[in-house]
Amino acid sequence: MFAEQQREYLDKGYTKIESFFSAEEVAKILEDVKQIELGAIGVASDNETYQFEKKNGETTKLLRRVENPHLYFDAIDSLVRSEKIVDLLRHFLGENIRLHNSKINFKPPSGAPVQWHQDWAFYPHTNDDFLTLGIFLDETSEKNGAMACLPGSHKGKVYDHRNVETGEFCHAISRSNWDEALDPTEGELLTGPVGTVTLHHVRTLHGSGPNHSTIRRRFLLIGYAAADAWPLLGCGNYGDYESLMVSGRSTVFPRMVELPLTVPYPLSMYGDRIFESQRALTQKYY
């Protein structure tokens, strides 16, 4: 059913399916997102769940991101485990699949960019059968900060995501670490209507510009991995880790593949969250 998208994913490192979710299905998701937004009222600063846009170093009341909403909101937990999503994932990851994380990026008007990076630098595993599935909750265009991916970059090197002067890990690639294979002008914007789904490989280079429009760009992102991909930084509580299985069977015999990798250390002075950590990047693209 998704043969064309499979070929594109293997070749480019990403693909998209427009209107994968119907208007009615997205409306239901947005009902839950509204409750999540209401939960941010009264929150004064970033916490474990909510992150806010910053202006001149000061926290605003503009919601930037909700971290791991599946842990706190039953409806989102049901969505990330839904048969509709899992059936799609089987075409890319096989039968045995584990949920890794989730987040909603809100990108309000004037919302900040996300500098170019590879997710693989953040959470290395024993193999890279690992992807992020995204759902457009608003119509998404270049003007309101659509994500761009660099075709074929998932087959290449893993770049250093550290400040070249201080050595601190900043969740982004300094321009001085770029080479001829990293040219953001060759990136492909993933745009589309509400309900569009994107999938990008964990090693794919990607980033997104600021929101220059008057329309926010809400983007639900969900990470999934093959069940035999073991997190090299540890799994935390093993019971919680096992509860993240969404399809098939788990294993205690990880599949090890020789791959380029790095580890996300030493931590940035701004912490381990991408938006704040990228403040430590001195050679930005956006």
Curated annotation (Swiss-Prot):
Keywords, sorted A to Z: Dioxygenase, Oxidoreductase
The terms under GO molecular function for this entry are: 2-oxoglutarate-dependent dioxygenase activity; iron ion binding
- Which Enzyme Commission number(s) are listed? 1.-.-.-
Q: Which InterPro entries did the record assign?
A: Phytyl_CoA_dOase-like
Q: List the signal peptide residues.
A: none
Record function comment = Required for hypophosphite oxidation.
Say which family it is in.
Belongs to the PhyH family.
Enumerate the PANTHER family for this protein: PHYTANOYL-COA DIOXYGENASE DOMAIN CONTAINING 1, PHYTANOYL-COA HYDROXYLASE
Q: What is this protein called?
A: Probable alpha-ketoglutarate-dependent hypophosphite dioxygenase
Originating organism: Stutzerimonas stutzeri
